[in-house]
Each structure stands twice: as structure tokens, then as C-alpha cells.
Amino acid sequence: MLESEESVMILKKPDSLTYPGTSFCPGCAHGISDRIIAESVEALGMREKFIPTVDVACGAWSMDIWDFDTVMCAHGRPMAVAAGIKRARPDALVAAYLGDGAAYSIGTAETVHCALRNENIVAIVLNNGVFGMTGGQMAPTTLPGQKTASSVKGRDPKTQGGVFDIVKTIGYMDIAYLARAALDSPAGIIKAQKYIQ
């Protein structure tokens, strides 16, 4: 760059991301989602009022990365805890951040009942189709034919059941907002960030 040229920063780390490394597996989308959540919260001017909830699965590592007052919950319970926080702190922006195993397996009741009550929280679920933290076993969201540690020949719906689809499960309910995005491309990441904001 020439000295006379003016440099313009077009992308920087959000102030609410503090940890330079990651504990996430290679290829995992948690790091991407952590960043777009931080960018979205800052863009909304809600950094001091944002309270995310996470559980003991992979999303818990976000506590090492975010500079937010984050609440650690039992596995599958971030939505229920987020609902309680929002009722106690109605001025806060409260989000439940969890994986598909937590939201659609052990936390199915919390997910469905928060939707039935139309709780005023943001729920962000990362669906990778497996139980990632415990070794990649089949999850309720594992697709037919998808190979996992516990479905080595691929998921067979005849013997292992169908796939859990959150949109089909709660899409008919009177909820404020429901969206699905993929973090597999720059366009998908931009779309997801717009959904979050």
C-alpha cells in the first residue's frame, strides 16, 4: 500500500468476542455463529442488555469467546432458562443458544412449550445432524442415509425412525418468527445474520 493511500477497515472482530482461539472441531459452524451473534448484538446496540443461555454441550464453549453475561444451563434447558430470565428482566435481549441434540432431543419439551407460549426470546439452534460432542452419534435430525458413529450404514427410517423437523413441528403455532439458514457459504452466513437481526 502506498503511503498516500488511505486504509479503510472493512471487517473487524466484534468487541464482544474476546478469545482468539477456539475449542470447536474443524469445520464446525459454532465459531461462525458466535461471530454473527456478537456482530448482530452490537449492531442492535444491545451489548449491555444481551443475556445468552447455553448448555453443557458444544455451545458452552461460547462462554470462553463471548464477552456477555452468559448463563450456563443443564443440557437441553437453555430455552426454559431464557424464558425465566426474560420474565424477570423484560428489558433484556435474551437468547437460548444450543445444538440440535439439546433442542430437539433432551430439550424437546422446552423447545415445544416455549413455542406454544410464544416466549419473547431468541432461540438459535445449530443443527449439524449428529450429537457432535459425544462422538458423532445419530441424532433426531440425522438425515436418511447419513452415516454416523451409531448408524454406520446410514440412517434407515424403517428401523431408526424419521427425521425431526422443527419447522413442521412448530411452524403452525402462533409464534412471532421462525427461520432456517445454512452457514455453509458466505451468502448463507449473510442470510443467517439478517435473520438474527
Regions found by a protein language model. Give the residues of each.
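Glycine-rich ThDP/TPP pyrophosphate-binding loop and its adjacent helix/strand module
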Residues: I106-R117, L126, V130-Q197
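Active-site diphosphate/adenylate-binding microenvironment
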Residues: V8-A74
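Structural signal for hydrophobic packing residues in well-ordered secondary-structure cores
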Residues: V41-E48, A60, R89, G161, ...
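General beta-strand structural signal in soluble alpha/beta enzymes
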Residues: I51-D55, A96, A123-L126, L178-A182
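Thiamine diphosphate
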Residues: C58-G132, K194
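Short, Lys/Arg-enriched N-terminal segments with co-localized hydrophobic residues
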Residues: M1-V8
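Electropositive phosphate-/nucleotide-binding environments in soluble metabolic enzymes
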Residues: D15, T22, G27-D34, M72-H75, ...
